[in-house]
Amino acid sequence: MKIIIADDDSIIREGLKMIISSQPDFEVTGIACNGAEAVELCRKYKTDIALLDIRMLVMDGIEAAKIMLEENLCKPLLLTTFDEQELIQRALK
């Protein structure tokens, strides 16, 4: 399974990369600092899943996920450590 990671925190990006890369059937095909970069990586590489932080600069994970779904690029999976109901409801739409 080919996976792209998008998070504005370098420690989170590297941690996720290390965990995912240790799994035999998973391959990290790209790492992005924001949603716009993640969308471009999905367009460039055949990707199965994009792990997206909800809150990022330039383009957040919710907007990136909408584009990925509209263009049928990959399956987005949104991640957050925030407990904000409004943000969660926006992501579920």
Please give the residue ranges for each predicted region.
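Active-site residues of response regulator receiver
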Residues: D7, D53
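The feature encodes the CheY-like receiver
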Residues: I12, L57, T80
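Short hydrophobic/Thr-rich beta-strand motif most characteristic of the beta2 strand and flanking loop
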Residues: D25-C33, L41
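Acidic catalytic/metal-coordinating carboxylates
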Residues: N34-E37, V58-E63
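Short amphipathic alpha-helix used as the core "switch/output" element in two-component signaling
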Residues: E40, I62-L73
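The short loop immediately C-terminal to the conserved phospho-acceptor aspartate in CheY-like receiver
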Residues: D48, I54-R55
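Alpha4 helix (beta4-alpha4-beta5 surface) of REC/receiver domains from two-component response regulators
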Residues: E63, D83-K93
